[in-house]
């Protein structure tokens, strides 16, 4: 980016504004604002980036003032009252003595005459305060014969509130608060929806909350966590992986692994599903994908977890594929290819890591499979893992001294992590069910807390296992293992 060109365009924009050539001035202002925006994306130093954003904000204010001048001049040509002279004297405040004659009392009440005076006066004070910069000094010649409640006044007041909001956002960021993403160019509702429904900071899921899966934890540490701790090492050919695909049966802990990665790295966590990135309006889905990755780069370091990615980016070229679905897939592939993480000259601490999970890896598009460089298998828990899962799920429940969790772990072979959680939940409710059996509503309400806190016994688990069967078949496991032999990259 040529900084001299930025300075030259800003200078020309101000000169044209001072000479009264407002159309050319607005063109130069738009160009320099876009140049600064692109330059800010390439700046890595937060202090320097903040200064550039402050310069861009000042130029935006000047640009808005030029637009206000053009709007005022156009209004003079269209609806200027012919009976009252236009005064060009520059005054910081409006004097009620020089206002046009009041309208008849039957048309407007006196309180309504004075209300615009209270609203317009702070705006003129704000315009006078920033008049020292660039062409803003020419923004003061305003007709005193204007009607106080025109649409132009409302637009000016709205712009003043928006500019004040932007300044408050920047001041908050300088005070150490979380900066807010500037969604210029996007629909405000789309930005707010992604902020509200997707962004999850500090998920608070740690490695200790996940039983077993040591190989998967080791690979995820190497792919995501270690580049944050050792940025100087992971450069060049050792750059971090662009993306990781987690493959396995349902309920094996893929989502929890992604949240643990975000917690251990201290990154912003984006939990994305197919419903998040789809819209009934043409072109909106592609915008959502692009907006998601721009927000991820803004809040970097970031972890984007795309759950059930086969529903978003299934194999292209099939007979039942729709044009809109193909466009979304293409945009997703382009954005993922642009999120290179830490390339040779990039900062690994600003990387965007893409994690994906699927239960149907054989339906994923080949181009997406290439971009997800690491493809790991999340299997069913082993005997040791099942025992750890039982301990984690039952750590808040009182257990009978005679119960042996290792024996129960042997009986639940083939159960997924979610199945084991359901077994523990059902077993912990058995004592309560026996206690309230045959009681009426009033008697149940009268029970004390101590009467319900009965220890979980081995018999409770036996009853729960009779009611809950495993959800993954041997044929499904064979399909996963066959796919990993052909396409796995652990």
Curated annotation (Swiss-Prot):
InterPro entries reported in the protein's UniProt record: AAA+_ATPase (IPR003593), AAA_lid_3 (IPR041569), ATPase_AAA_core (IPR003959), ATPase_AAA_CS (IPR003960), KATNA1 (IPR028596), KATNA1_MIT (IPR048611), Katnal1_chordates (IPR028594), KTNA1_AAA_dom (IPR048612)
One GO process term, biological-process aspect: microtubule severing
Enzyme category, top tier: isomerase
Low complexity bias locations: 128-139
Catalytic activity: n ATP + n H2O + a microtubule = n ADP + n phosphate + (n+1) alpha/beta tubulin heterodimers
Keyword Transmembrane helix: no
Cell compartments where the protein resides: Cytoplasm, Cytoskeleton; Cytoplasm; Cytoplasm, Cytoskeleton, Spindle pole; Cytoplasm, Cytoskeleton, Spindle
GO molecular function, one term: ATP binding
Coiled coil: none
One GO location term (cellular component): cytoplasm
Subunit structure, interactors included: Interacts with KATNB1 and KATNBL1.
Entry's family note: Belongs to the AAA ATPase family. Katanin p60 subunit A1 subfamily. A-like 1 sub-subfamily.
Protein role: Regulates microtubule dynamics in Sertoli cells, a process that is essential for spermiogenesis and male fertility. Severs microtubules in an ATP-dependent manner, promoting rapid reorganization of cellular microtubule arrays. Has microtubule-severing activity in vitro.
Name of the featured protein: Katanin p60 ATPase-containing subunit A-like 1
């Amino acid at each position: 980016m040529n900084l001299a060109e930025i300075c030259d365009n800003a200078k020309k924009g101000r000169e044209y504004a001072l000479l009264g050539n407002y159309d050319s001035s607005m063109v130069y202002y738009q160009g320099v604002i876009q140049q600064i925006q692109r330059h800010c994306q390439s700046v890595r130093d937060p202090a320097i980036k903040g200064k550039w954003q402050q310069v861009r904000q000042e130029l935006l204010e000047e640009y808005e003032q030029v637009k206000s001048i053009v709007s005022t001049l156009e209004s003079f040509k269209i609806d200027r009252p012919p009976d009252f002279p236009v005064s060009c004297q520059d005054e910081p405040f409006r004097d009620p003595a020089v206002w046009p004659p009041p309208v008849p009392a039957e048309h407007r009440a006196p309180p309504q005459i004075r209300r615009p005076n209270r609203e317009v006066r702070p705006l003129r004070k704000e315009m006078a305060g920033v008049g020292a910069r660039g062409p803003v000094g020419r923004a003061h010649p305003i007709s005193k014969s204007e009607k106080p409640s025109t649409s132009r006044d409302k637009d000016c007041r709205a712009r003043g509130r928006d500019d004040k909001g932007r300044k408050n956002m920047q001041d908050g960021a300088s005070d150490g608060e979380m900066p807010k993403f500037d969604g210029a160019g996007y629909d405000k509702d789309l930005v707010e929806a992604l902020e509200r429904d997707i962004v999850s900071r500090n998920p608070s899921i740690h490695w200790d909350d996940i039983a077993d899966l040591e190989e998967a934890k080791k690979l995820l540490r190497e792919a995501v966590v270690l580049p944050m701790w050792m940025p100087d090492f992971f450069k060049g050919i050792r750059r971090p992986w662009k993306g990781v695909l987690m493959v396995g049966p349902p309920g094996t802990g893929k989502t929890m692994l992604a949240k643990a990665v975000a917690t251990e790295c201290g990154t912003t966590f984006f939990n994305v599903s197919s419903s998040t990135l789809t819209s009934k309006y043409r072109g909106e889905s592609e915008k959502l994908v692009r907006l998601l990755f721009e927000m991820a780069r803004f809040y970097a370091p970031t972890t984007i977890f795309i759950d059930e990615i086969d529903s978003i980016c299934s194999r292209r070229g099939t007979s039942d594929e729709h044009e809109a679905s193909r466009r979304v897939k293409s945009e997703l592939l382009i954005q993922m290819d642009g999120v290179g993480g830490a390339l040779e000259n990039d900062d690994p601490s600003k990387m965007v890591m893409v994690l994906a999970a699927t239960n149907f890896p054989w339906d994923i598009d080949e181009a997406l499979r290439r971009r997800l460089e690491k493809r790991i298998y999340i299997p069913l828990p082993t005997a040791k893992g099942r025992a750890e899962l039982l301990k984690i799920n039952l750590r808040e429940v009182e257990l009978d001294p005679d119960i042996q969790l290792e024996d129960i772990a042997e009986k639940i072979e083939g159960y997924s992590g979610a199945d084991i959680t359901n077994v523990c939940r059902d077993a912990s409710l058995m004592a309560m069910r026996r206690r309230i059996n045959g009681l009426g509503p009033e008697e149940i309400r009268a029970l004390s807390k101590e009467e319900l806190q009965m220890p979980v016994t081995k018999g409770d688990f036996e009853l729960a296992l009779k009611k809950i069967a495993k959800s993954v078949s041997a044929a499904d496991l064979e399909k996963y293992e066959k796919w990993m032999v052909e396409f796995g990259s652990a």
